[in-house]
């Protein structure tokens, strides 16, 4: 979609291309104080908002998707083995060298940017509503790191030169996130419009609290390996329900508005109009490249001839993300609209996202996917073979359907926005 957050750039560029003959410059321009205009603040804030775009596109997505019950990270007789980073996620054989878990620095950088703008805008003396968005993003980034890595440093200030900030227990980080969110929610915007899309709002912060609270016993457990889900007591459950109710009663969201069906919510033209999205990353092939989900989820040789998307793919596909049989079962239910996001059984051709009855042909034959994945060997490579049989192992996701111009002309990037918090999660 075409994002609105960066419209301030156009204003700046217009100024750069205009001649100037008026030398009566305001005296403030002689100083290096931080600009206080709305445009200047928006420019600085946008850098924070987009800090998670890179990890969400690739490494964070790999770590979350492949280590869950959703996908398996396959290899093809050595192709896409990549030091077992993908299969390690699926088998929970994590290594410090795995690229798929290497997003810590990018997310921590977002925290540093947030801390810098908080200082630039006045720190503790700043108006609460001015720095609330930066504090919200700082809390969100802490959540991502805490959820992924456990014990992490609490980065609530700009570090001094050579300052060592020690890791804190996961429980303390969770409590810090909670404290921050409770403090800033009253100062965040409560609108849900094109202007607030992709930015922290009251609803984004409340949705983050819900996610924090629903897993509170895990995050605050003395030791996760000793946590017993059958006997825990969630002291935050009432608060979790209360914030769900707040989002529901706010009346800003619903499951269907802005979409023409479940699958269309995730198409390349999705945007702020999709009222199921509480908080989303607004990828755009013109201004925010990097959303490349189709590259890893598309059948490996779909680039041969015309793809099952209905157009020729000019860039190669990895094809290594295969849905687990258990996940596939959830999306192959009779009469369920969500079935449309899964490529299953005999592959059909699609026409502008609509499944046709025409078989897709590869090397002269229709192709049929196997729900139950067969490996060539029972080892950590998860090798299915570099051949048609291997490519057909596992159903594939077409949830974030690509379009030709994006994929072929922008380095496999896509316009599809990625929801981080959805109204469906709250319900």
Language-model segments: which ranges?
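Conserved, well-structured interaction surfaces
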Residues: 38-56, 77-149, 163-175, 179-197, ...
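Membrane-proximal, proline-rich intrinsically disordered regions
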Residues: 20-67, 94-96, 234
């Amino acid at each position: 979609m075409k994002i609105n957050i960066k419209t301030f750039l156009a204003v700046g560029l217009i100024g750069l291309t205009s001649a100037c003959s008026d030398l009566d410059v305001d005296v403030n321009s002689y100083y290096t104080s931080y600009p206080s205009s709305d445009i200047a603040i928006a420019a600085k804030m946008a850098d924070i908002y987009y800090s998670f775009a890179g990890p969400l596109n690739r490494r964070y997505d790999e770590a979350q998707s492949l280590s869950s019950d959703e996908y398996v990270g396959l290899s093809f007789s050595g192709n896409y083995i990549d030091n077992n980073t993908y299969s390690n996620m699926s088998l929970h054989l994590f290594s410090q060298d795995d690229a798929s878990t290497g997003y810590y620095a990018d997310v921590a950088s977002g925290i540093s940017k947030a801390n810098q703008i908080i200082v630039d805008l006045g720190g503790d003396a700043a108006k609460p509503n001015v720095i609330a968005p930066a504090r919200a993003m700082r809390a969100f980034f802490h959540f991502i790191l805490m959820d992924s890595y456990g014990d992490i440093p609490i980065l609530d200030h700009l570090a001094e030169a050579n300052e060592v900030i020690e890791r804190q227990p996961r429980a303390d980080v969770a409590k810090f996130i909670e404290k921050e969110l409770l403090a800033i929610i009253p100062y965040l915007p409560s609108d849900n419009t094109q202007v607030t899309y992709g930015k922290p709002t009251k609803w984004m912060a409340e949705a983050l609290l819900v996610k924090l609270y629903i897993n509170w016993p895990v995050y605050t457990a003395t030791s996760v390996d000793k946590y017993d889900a059958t006997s825990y007591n969630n002291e935050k459950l009432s608060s979790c329900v209360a914030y769900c109710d707040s989002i529901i009663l706010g009346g800003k969201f619903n499951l269907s508005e802005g979409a023409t069906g479940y699958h269309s919510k995730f198409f390349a033209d999705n945007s702020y109009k999709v009222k199921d999205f509480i908080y989303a990353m607004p990828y755009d092939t013109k201004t925010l490249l990097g959303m490349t989900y189709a590259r890893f989820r598309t059948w490996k040789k779909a680039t041969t001839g015309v793809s099952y998307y209905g157009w020729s793919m000019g860039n190669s596909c990895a094809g290594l993300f295969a849905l687990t049989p258990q996940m596939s079962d959830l999306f192959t239910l009779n009469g369920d609209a969500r079935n449309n996001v899964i490529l299953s059984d005999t592959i059909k051709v699609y026409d502008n996202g609509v499944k046709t009855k025409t078989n897709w042909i590869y090397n002269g034959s229709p192709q049929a996917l196997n729900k139950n994945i067969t490996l060539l060997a029972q080892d950590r490579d998860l090798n299915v073979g570099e051949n048609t049989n291997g490519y057909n192992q596992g159903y594939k996701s077409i949830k974030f359907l690509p379009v030709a111009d994006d994929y072929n002309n922008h380095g496999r990037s896509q316009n599809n926005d990625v929801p981080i918090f959805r109204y469906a999660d709250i319900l």
